[in-house]
């Protein structure tokens, strides 16, 4: 019997001056970056929580505690890959994933293909299995005011 599981993930970080902006593992030329203990990559963080949740495992904060000095400035794609290994040990494979950036800017279109490639590489899957999209909140809320960015992700696992 084939078993399917769905997981969701959500992450948000404040935008901060003097910090590089990394989204989907791609460094983007932008005047502000995402504050966080790691590189603040909300796309990778949301996807990490989605795959962990689908497998019924702990969340990203339990697996990689934000206060752990060893994780300061960590590459979020490496964290995603480590989390994915825990998921794979339980026999799961990725059917597909969908990751959405929520914010007014930056525009993702010029970077989308590379983000898909890098997120998929961390999961050791074909980029066709990982969708990367963006939406705005039409100026509403903290993302609409440009105070931060958010991301949500859905992952479907199969075994």
Model-predicted regions and their roles:
Residues 132-136:
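Pyridoxal 5′-phosphate
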Residues 145-159:
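C-terminal edge-of-domain segments
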Residues 2-118, 122-123:
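RNase III-family endoribonuclease catalytic core
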Residues 126-129:
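Short acidic capping loops at alpha-helix termini that bridge into adjacent secondary structure
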């Amino acid at each position: 019997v084939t078993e399917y599981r769905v997981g969701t993930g959500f992450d948000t970080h404040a935008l901060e001056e003097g910090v590089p902006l990394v989204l989907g593992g791609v460094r983007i030329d932008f005047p502000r970056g995402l504050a966080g203990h790691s590189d603040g990559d909300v796309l990778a963080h949301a996807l990490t929580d989605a795959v962990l949740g689908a497998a019924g495992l702990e969340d990203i904060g339990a697996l990689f505690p934000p206060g752990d000095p060893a994780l300061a400035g960590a590459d979020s794609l490496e964290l995603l890959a480590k989390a994915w290994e825990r998921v794979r040990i339980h026999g799961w494979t990725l059917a597909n994933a969908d990751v959405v950036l929520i914010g007014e800017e930056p525009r993702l279109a010029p970077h989308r293909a590379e983000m898909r490639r890098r997120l998929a590489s961390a999961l050791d899957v074909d980029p066709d299995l990982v969708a990367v999209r963006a939406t705005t909140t039409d100026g509403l809320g903290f993302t609409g005011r440009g105070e931060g960015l958010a991301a949500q992700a859905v992952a479907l696992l199969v075994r």
